Amino acid sequence: VARLSVWTKVFASGRTWIDGPDGYYHLRRAFLTLQRWPRVPLTDSFMSVPSGSRISWPPLFDGLLATLALPWRASAPIASLERIGALLPAILGVLQVALIVILTRLLASHRAALIAGACAAFFPTLVRYTLLGTLDHDPFFECTLLLALIGIAAAPRRGSIAAVTAGITLAILGWAGSIVGVAIVAAFALARAFTSSSETRIEIGRALFLANVIAAGIALPFVMASPWEGATFEGLSWFHETALLGAAAAGAAIAWRDRRVAIGGAIALLGAIALLPISLLPALRGLLYAGGHAPIFAGVAETQPLLFLFGRFDLWPALIRFGFLPLLAVVALRRKAQLPLATWCIVALGLALLHSRFSYTAATPLCIAAGIAVDELLAAHSRIRVAIMSALMIAPTLIAYLPIPGFAAFNFYERTTPILSSAAPGACDFLRSVAAEDPALRNPYVQPAWSVLAPWYHGHWIMWIGQRATVINPMLSVGQPAFDDGMRFFVRAGESNAMEIVQRHHVRYVVVTPDLASLPTQAAMIGSEPPQDLREAMHVLPMHLAYWGASEVRAFGDTYPALPFDEVWRSREVRPGPFGLVPLMRVYRVRSAV
């Protein structure tokens, strides 16, 4: 119910609205997969025109989305993909709660499992990423991670090896960042081995070893076919094989008494060592990337440190996500038996503090720890006392559900879906109508007829709703050769240089927004210097078009030349600017492209 509570926001005006930009590219890739099912494209000419782009996401998640839409492939592929894509996060969210209950039961009592499940069902951080319409790979990854951890916690029970193998394999083929999951599973296994008997320790090590070896073998053909050469964390590559072999060697070290596993572990270790020279630098870059230390993240709020989410120290984002649950978790984590859970919490919370999107990853072990803690407290204190204390611990998280003045951006029902607050739907509908369907819409291997140059965060919307190729998009620089060049168009002063970029990327339409305040942030994303003052900023071609139109303007003792663009669409919505009210969005056609 909590995950479906935004139904009227997602299914509105006869359309399906996905929350956030990345979900729209998941839809496009699934749409491309439907054209040639079961082959999932690894590159796409519709992005980063004219070079095209490598897709950083492994194929499994988008292949799953396409497979679910197969019955409607001939009749209504776009509408069915949108509806399935909107429902899938909520379904995965319910599955995640069930897996949390199972894992908690393996770690503690039946009552602790039910409490952890109840917490997970309503905990805002878990609900936020599994709300109806919040299409992305995150809940899929968390479910695979839980499956692998269930296997480790269940050892030496029957099926534990299969669970770990399935979890790690699905994770690797579903998200390039799943190396984080491999590390968490390995750390969890090492901690559990430390607290277990010698017989159980061998089974844990065997499960970790076999699961990673099998996952490495299954992933190998995909790595060899991947457009990402060498080793990199940005896409499925030899770096992932290195991580899997390293985790397999760690498993063999735990089960060193098993001679066959020890020999296999030695072979895995040699393989990891052989790949280490090409993987060390990607590993360092991956750590910095996971920690949010990359220039391109300057303009992406969810990649900022949790306590500095908006550029200044602020506890509220952390309190709304977690409440005081970390304090409650200490009650459960102080015992040696819960060392595996404590290890998981420390790793996940550390990642969340560095990179706020990992709050979702950290919420799962916190819910489990909270369930165990409340169970222990109920054994020592009255129910009323424990209920009051628990309510106080989660009180800050209620901001996500209740309307509190000043916190609308954190509330599930008051926050605005990004695409609907941007005037992008109208612009996308216009772009879709201006010409016949582009051949590259259904075939990612042919060159698009022309492209649209729009602010990076509009790229996926334009590709899916507008059905037009783009130069830059929310993939940022990952696999996108045109990203830096396209960003320079939006942040650097100089009309002639901007026109060269337009010609270089086969641009026919330009989308502009009056957003002077974002220039420093966008410039930082490519390591560029922003304009120093308003006089210089208005020489940034998109700012000229957004505030003044394409005509010549004399201002600030300077002359701003007329630009070879024709305005073809503008939004009804307006916003105030330094020169009066201006449209929230405008679309221009490049005159030389007529």
Question: Where are the predicted features?
Answer:
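Membrane-embedded helix bundles of polyisoprenyl
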Residues: 2, 88-106, 112-197, 208-226, ...
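Alpha-helical transmembrane segments at the extracellular/periplasmic loop-to-helix junctions
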Residues: 237-254, 261-342
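Extracytoplasmic
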Residues: 390-594
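Active-site lumenal/periplasmic loops and adjacent helix-entry segments of GT-C-fold
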Residues: 4-107, 111-119, 123-146, 179
